[in-house]
C-alpha cells in the first residue's frame, strides 16, 4: 500500500493538500494521532477488499503529543520496514504569511493560549514538527501561493509522477526577495548580462522573445545553460537511484524577471525529454504582474 503523510505548520495549506489527494483517489484521514499509524496500516493490510485502502493519505500536526513527535523518526523507519510505500509532504510558509492567514480567518492557533501569543505558537510549532520536516520527500513553500496555485502544484507533482520516478521543479526567483526555502539546489545567474538596463526590455520577462534574443546574443548565456544541464545530467540520476522522489532546482537573478526566468525555461524544455514530470514555476512574475510592472 501507498501512504502519504501530509504535515506542516497550521495555516500552511495542509487541508488543501489533503483535499487534492482525496480527489486523486486517496483515502484521507485528517489529524491522525501518530500512535495510530501502525494500527491503520495493519487494518489496511487485512482488508478483504484492499483496493479502497491501497492508497491512503493522513495529515499529522502539532496537536500530537510532543513525545510522539520527537519519536517520529523511529516510527517512520519501522513503517518502512513493513513494506509500506511511504512518502512525506511537508508544507510551510514564512512567519509573516502565517500570521496574516490567521488574522484573515480569525482562527485560533492550536498551540496558542492565554500565555502563548500567536507568533510564539507559530515558532513553537516549527520546532515540534522538525522530526517530520527533516524527513520530507517533498517540501512545499506556500508563501505567496493562492489556494488554487497550491492545489495545482500538489496535483501536478503527485499525480504526474509515476512510482519510483523523479519529479523535477525548476523555479526562478529574485535574490532581493530571498532564496526559496524549499530548494534542493540553488544556482545564481546574476553574472549574465542584465536585460533590465535596456529600458525597452524592462516591461518584458524571460519568456518574451525580445529578452530571449538579448540573452542569446551573449555566448556566456549558452555556456551557463550548457554547464547547468551537464551538471544536472550527471547528478540527477544518482538522486533517482537513491529513491529520491522530488527535486527542486531554484535559479536566481536580482529580481526574478529576466535571466532566471529564461534559464528555468531552457532547463525545463531540455529535461522534459528525459523526465516525465517536469514543472517550471516563476515565483516573482505573478507579483510583478499584480503591481503592473510587466
From Swiss-Prot:
Binding site for GTP: 61-64
InterPro entries assigned to the protein according to its UniProt record, in alphabetical order: P-loop_NTPase, RapZ-like, RapZ-like_N, RapZ_C
Coiled-coil segments: none
GO molecular function terms noted in the UniProt entry: ATP binding; GTP binding
A Pfam family reported for this protein in Swiss-Prot or TrEMBL: RapZ-like_N
Binding site for ATP: 8-15
Domain of life: Bacteria
Keyword terms of this UniProt record: ATP-binding, GTP-binding, Nucleotide-binding
The protein's role, per its UniProt record: Displays ATPase and GTPase activities.
HAMAP family: RapZ_like
Similarity annotation: Belongs to the RapZ-like family.
NCBIfam families associated with the record: PRK05416.1 (NF003828)
The protein's name: Nucleotide-binding protein Maqu_2718
